[in-house]
UniProtKB/Swiss-Prot annotation:
Function: Thiol-specific peroxidase that catalyzes the reduction of hydrogen peroxide and organic hydroperoxides to water and alcohols, respectively. Plays a role in cell protection against oxidative stress by detoxifying peroxides and as sensor of hydrogen peroxide-mediated signaling events.
Protein name per its UniProtKB record: Peroxiredoxin-5
Gene Ontology MF terms: thioredoxin-dependent peroxiredoxin activity
Keyword Mitochondrion: yes
Enzyme class: oxidoreductase
Note in the entry: On the 2D-gel the determined pI of this protein is: 5.8, its MW is: 16.9 kDa. The active site is a conserved redox-active cysteine residue, the peroxidatic cysteine (C(P)), which makes the nucleophilic attack on the peroxide substrate. The peroxide oxidizes the C(P)-SH to cysteine sulfenic acid (C(P)-SOH), which then reacts with another cysteine residue, the resolving cysteine (C(R)), to form a disulfide bridge. The disulfide is subsequently reduced by an appropriate electron donor to complete the catalytic cycle. In this atypical 2-Cys Prx, C(R) is present in the same subunit to form an intramolecular disulfide. The disulfide is subsequently reduced by thioredoxin.
Family: Belongs to the peroxiredoxin family. Prx5 subfamily.
Source species taxonomy: Eukaryota, Metazoa, Chordata, Craniata, Vertebrata
GO CC terms of this entry: mitochondrion; peroxisomal matrix
UniProt superkingdom: Eukaryota
Catalytic reaction list: a hydroperoxide + [thioredoxin]-dithiol = an alcohol + [thioredoxin]-disulfide + H2O
Subunit annotation: Monomer.
């Protein structure tokens, strides 16, 4: 599954 904003790792996944 693609990484969503605010997934498991803070900061990471900020690909809006």
């Amino acid at each position: 599954a693609p990484i969503k904003v605010g997934d498991a790792i803070p900061x990471v996944x900020v690909f809006e």
